[in-house]
Amino acid sequence: MVNKNQLTTKEKNRNKFAYFWISFYIIILSLTNILLTFLISHLSILSIIIALAIVIVSAIWTWRQPFQDNILCLHLHDVSNMLGGILLGILAAYWLSSQEKLISFLIPIAIIDFISFTRFGIWTPNRKLIENKTIAKRLSICMPIPGFSGLYQITGVGDMFVFALIVGSTLKIW
């Protein structure tokens, strides 16, 4: 008798294929984040603030659109989430101009993020956002995985923000 909990070989291969695509997307998004942070950090603060305002308007518009109806809207949603996180990270890098400020800002974020993914963080706001699938998709960069229906959340706006903050601060400090 076959145990229902055991995965078939086909399902295991399908999961390995999905992990490949997720890893590929994460690497591409990380490299894109580094490149955009480097390029945008050379702009003036005023132009960064104007770009952030445009991205916020774009994000509000795309968040109100259904995901499955328009592929262009989906990509605009992903781009606005990515640029929004990067622009906020660069602005925070200007504000956190020293290593001490940066470290004192990042340590609580890392602790809260770690706690929210453990059983101790059931009541944290971050965990509640993650469990609400609609809000989580709106605050994530979602990509299709071949062989799977729907969209898969690759990374969140907060992750893009923190990564851009680290890269932007590194460019600014050193």
Question: Residue locations for each model-derived region?
Answer:
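A membrane-topology feature that recognizes alpha-helical transmembrane segments
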Residues: 1-174
